Amino acid sequence: MASPAAGGVVIIGSGLIGRSWAMLFASGGFKVKLYDIEQQQITNALESIRKEMKSLEQSGSLKGSLGAEQQLSLISGCGNLAEAVEGAMHIQECVPENLELKKKIFAQLDRIVDDQVILSSSSSCLLPSKLFTGLAHVKQCIVAHPVNPPYYVPLVELVPHPETAPATMDRTYALMKKIRQTPVRVLKEIDGFVLNRLQYAIISEAWRLVEEGIVSPNDLDLVMSDGLGMRYAFIGPLETMHLNAEGMVSYCDRYSEGMKRVLKTFGPVPEFSGDTVEKVNQDMCMKVPDDPEHLAARRHWRDDCLMQLSKLKHQMQPQ
């Protein structure tokens, strides 16, 4: 078996995101300690990880160069926070998206860690200035926001606190590359970071188009899945602009007036309530009933699609 990568990783919280991070770090050869306050939660998480890794290995989708048993041997559980973080080089917090809970966790960590470990939060929208301000080890703090489900979608947004040391960003970036994720540097904090700001802009306009009777919910989803989404799976909106003309300058010369005209027709932020909720819910439930069994089956199908897409993207990388 290959030697474990230097330094250990600690995962705080054994839910879906925590389990996914544990699998990703193990795939890179890192020893992983999974911490939770409830021993039964740890036991359940380790069993879930075992089942998923075995399934991934059978389907040829397991990440990394190590086999499932080798990766599983790198993951252990721990119910004592001080013991868990001893000797760690990276701590990834994965507790629920609650500011006070996360601040409590980081305050506890701040009292017991050394001056070398990276303190990273998986928060999807809480600003680093709200999470880390006042900590003695604030220079070692960063948000590393994964995309759900992290094992199948590689993007990780790295968001610094205003006092985060450049070395913390660099080390976290290198670590994400080591486990074959795709890190992006958010140069300064902003509400919603980058991914959710783009996602919410799409959701907002999608909602308005349905609410105003322009398009049905199902057809709206098709516009993304069979239209924009197919391009955006391989190139982003800015490169799309660049390729859809003779470069970016040409695109802006040709289309900027039309874009501005349409953008001026966008309405206010929707309320996401009332009749439109019922309308969208009805169409979605016709496609996927909202009982646990059907939702789980659809998520499983989604994850299979994402894994196959990930393989295709790897194969299609430009030479």
Curated annotation (Swiss-Prot):
Which EC number(s) does UniProt give? 1.1.1.45
Q: Give residues annotated as binding NAD(+).
A: 16-17, 36, 97, 102
Q: Could you tell me what this protein is called?
A: Lambda-crystallin homolog
Relate the assembly described in the record.
Homodimer.
Q: Per the annotation, which location comes first and is thus the protein's main one?
A: cytoplasm
Q: Where in the cell is it found?
A: Cytoplasm
Please give the function described in this protein's UniProt entry. Answer: Has high L-gulonate 3-dehydrogenase activity. It also exhibits low dehydrogenase activity toward L-3-hydroxybutyrate (HBA) and L-threonate.
| Activity regulation description | Inhibited by malonate.
Q: Which InterPro entries match?
A: 3-OHacyl-CoA_DH (IPR022694), 3-OHacyl-CoA_DH_CS (IPR006180), 3-OHacyl-CoA_DH_NAD-bd (IPR006176), 3HC_DH_C (IPR006108), 6-PGluconate_DH-like_C_sf (IPR008927), 6PGD_dom2 (IPR013328), NAD(P)-bd_dom_sf (IPR036291)
Q: Identify its protein family.
A: Belongs to the 3-hydroxyacyl-CoA dehydrogenase family.
Q: Which residues carry this modification: Phosphoserine?
A: 3
List the source organism.
Rattus norvegicus (Rat)
| Pfam families with a match to the protein in the record | 3HCDH, 3HCDH_N
Its GO CC terms are: cytosol
Reaction catalysed by this chain?
L-gulonate + NAD(+) = 3-dehydro-L-gulonate + NADH + H(+)
Decide whether keyword Acetylation is in the record.
yes
Q: Name one GO molecular function term.
A: L-gulonate 3-dehydrogenase activity
Q: Which UniProt keywords are listed?
A: Acetylation, Cytoplasm, NAD, Oxidoreductase, Phosphoprotein
